[in-house]
């Protein structure tokens, strides 16, 4: 394609990824790619490869596949289904607002890959690229890894597009407002719980000490949401879920908190996951299934999950407002 034929603007939405199917073989392929990323597991490569291929990928795929089967729908992976709807709705929103832009979706691991999606955008003549990783709070293993994948592909291009990479939106007013509105809607429908738990994806505590701002960004998101909801310190809690391995991760842990709350007199809990832009295994199974059971088994009476922002109108409007300054 000639240079004169270029001049198109592209928006790339990027999320973590999902197996192609809820089977052990598909999950194994996905986990092998995910857990081979040095941004995700920061231990000496040779040692980790021995552990990964000698132990983890022998045991974990079948167990994870069974969990994926619980949340899989006729539309497939919940994360993929929601992400495709987000992409289509953002495209419609930007078009309605007068922007000529092509919106694409890529997954950091699995399909559609970052490389294949960028190549498709390149074929379309896109020479202005706006990347929005759908991780509200920057973290090196997520947002940082997304940038790595984009840079790896672009390093092979002769003609580079202008690039705008949105690295965090943890305190963006539209994001906070969308979260607050979703929580208020839940409170209006089901009543205000004794405690609102804001559960974020965890990470090794070591990452914090190495300078990763994720923990601080999670704290700020929580503070802004609690302030706008008018919650006292006793009415909300911040926790971290999905820990993996034996290292110390960010605390307090979500599962330990769910087990302890009933003994503290908290019998009615609502939980929201502000680090997840779309519902997925970690919310639909780990939170709704595992942690809901932990809470009720410990004596809790009412447990409910407030869905991720997914493709609701406030969320799509927020995405549009994030990318518009760069179009």
Swiss-Prot record:
**Gene3D superfamilies linked to this entry:** 3.40.50.1400
The alphabetized UniProt keywords are: Cytoplasm, Heme biosynthesis, Iron, Lyase, Metal-binding, Porphyrin biosynthesis
Pathway it acts in? Porphyrin-containing compound metabolism; protoheme biosynthesis; protoheme from protoporphyrin-IX: step 1/1
SUPFAM superfamilies from the entry? Answer: Chelatase (SSF53800)
Q: Which GO terms describe its molecular function?
A: ferrochelatase activity; metal ion binding
Q: GO BP, one example?
A: heme biosynthetic process
Q: Which InterPro entries match?
A: Ferrochelatase, Ferrochelatase_AS, Ferrochelatase_C, Ferrochelatase_N
Any Gene Ontology CC annotation: cytoplasm
Which Pfam families does this entry report, sorted A to Z? Ferrochelatase
* Reactions performed catalytically: heme b + 2 H(+) = protoporphyrin IX + Fe(2+)
Residues reported in the UniProt entry to bind Fe cation: 201, 282
Q: What is its main location?
A: cytoplasm
Q: What is its EC number?
A: 4.98.1.1
* Cell location: Cytoplasm
Q: What does this protein do?
A: Catalyzes the ferrous insertion into protoporphyrin IX.
What NCBIfam families does its record include? hemH
By sequence similarity, the record places it as follows: Belongs to the ferrochelatase family.
**Which protein is depicted?**
Ferrochelatase 2
> What gene is this protein a product of?
hemH2
């Amino acid at each position: 394609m000639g240079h004169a034929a270029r001049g198109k603007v592209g928006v790339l939405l990027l999320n973590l990824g999902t197996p192609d199917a809820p089977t052990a073989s598909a999950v194994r392929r996905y986990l092998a790619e995910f857990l081979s990323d040095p941004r995700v597991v920061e231990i000496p490569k040779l040692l980790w490869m021995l552990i990964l291929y000698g132990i983890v990928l022998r045991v974990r795929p079948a167990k994870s596949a069974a969990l994926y089967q619980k949340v899989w729908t006729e539309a497939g992976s919940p994360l993929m289904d929601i992400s495709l709807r987000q992409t289509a709705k953002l495209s419609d929103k930007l078009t309605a607002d007068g922007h000529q832009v092509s919106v694409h979706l890529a997954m950091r691991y699995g399909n559609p890959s970052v490389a294949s999606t960028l190549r498709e955008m390149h074929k379309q003549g896109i020479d202005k690229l706006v990347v929005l990783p759908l991780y509200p709070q920057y973290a090196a293993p997520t947002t940082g890894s997304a940038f790595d994948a984009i840079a790896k592909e672009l390093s092979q291009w002769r003609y580079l597009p202008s690039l705008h990479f949105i690295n965090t939106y943890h305190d963006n007013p539209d994001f906070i407002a969308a979260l607050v509105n979703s929580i208020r809607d839940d409170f209006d429908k089901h009543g205000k719980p004794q405690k609102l738990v804001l559960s974020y994806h965890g990470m090794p505590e070591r990452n914090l000490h190495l300078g990763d701002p994720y923990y601080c960004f999670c704290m700020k998101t929580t503070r802004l949401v609690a302030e706008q909801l008018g919650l006292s310190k006793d009415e909300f809690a911040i926790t971290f879920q999905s820990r993996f391995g034996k290292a110390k991760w960010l605390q307090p842990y979500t599962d330990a908190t769910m087990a302890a709350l009933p003994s503290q007199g908290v019998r009615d809990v609502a939980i929201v996951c502000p680090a997840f832009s779309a519902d997925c295994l970690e919310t639909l199974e780990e939170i709704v299934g595992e942690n809901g059971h932990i809470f009720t088994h410990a004596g809790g009476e009412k447990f409910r999950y407030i869905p991720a922002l997914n493709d609701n109108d406030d969320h799509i409007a927020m995405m549009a407002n994030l990318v518009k300054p760069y179009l």
